[in-house]
Amino acid sequence: MCAAIALLAGCASGIPLKESQPAVRERYAAYAGEPIRQFNWLGDYYSWEPVAKDELVVFTTPSEAYLLKVWPSCPDLIFVTGPIGLTSTSHTVSAGLDSVRTERMSCPIEEIRKVDYQRMQADLRREAQNKGSPGSGASPQR
């Protein structure tokens, strides 16, 4: 079997986040399902975001995301500023077999959880609408 590595040009740019890192991680974790063994991946991606020192979210499309946890022995993913890569076998990324690769390290994937990103976005839109509605404590628009 051939292991393929595809680089993910990072959206981890060092730009300050609107939310604290723990809040970002908790937001994704709240919408992540139970751990899965693997996911299909054709080597293409949309983006990625570090959410903890040993976790990142990889977007395979604009609406499909996976929360990946790597071995705790890996250095902080939060500080990775360049592209990352994922190893895969036959277009499948597997926990316990594949790794997240950066310029300086290879971090084995310990756990994969699919994020219900569409539901998360819908809930965030609903929250934003509620903040702007009368009686929600926000100032009404004039």
PLM feature segments, named:
Residues 71-142:
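Helix-rich interaction surfaces within compact, conserved domain-sized segments
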Residues 5-6, 95:
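Intrinsic-disorder/low-complexity peptide segments enriched for small residues
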Residues 6, 43, 107:
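Structured loop/turn residues at beta-strand edges in well-structured enzyme cores
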Residues 1-2:
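Sec-dependent signal peptide recognition
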Residues 8-10:
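C-terminal motif of bacterial Sec signal peptides marking the signal peptidase cleavage site
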Residues 12-69, 128-139:
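N-terminal secretory signal peptides
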